[in-house]
């Protein structure tokens, strides 16, 4: 049921949440050639996971909100930390953008901010997809073997 709703059954988290960040990253990347997007960027507001789904058009948003309450605790905690980090970067970016920067300054700000955010969004995606979950007792060798086994199980 969760997998059909694009909610990871292991972590009980949905990657759809990352669209909230991907949209603003796209606008930041376009700021150099389209400075008229600055007001749209300034209109961005942080939204917690639950609030995002409450206001979204995601088909299974109610299921996503219930799954969030039962999410794997370490995954949820790690995702919340990354959300805080991304929100802090965006708060500083929005503050800087409000200072009527030159076109060159706006372009640089957009490039820098999107460059900081993209790896965090990628990492958040790996947390949502459960790619970071491994038993603590695994050695490097057993971890490598587990990864190889997983690849073959998926038919890659």
Regions found by a protein language model. Name each.
Residues 1-145:
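Signal-transmission coiled-coils
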Residues 142-156:
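Short acidic DE-rich linear segments
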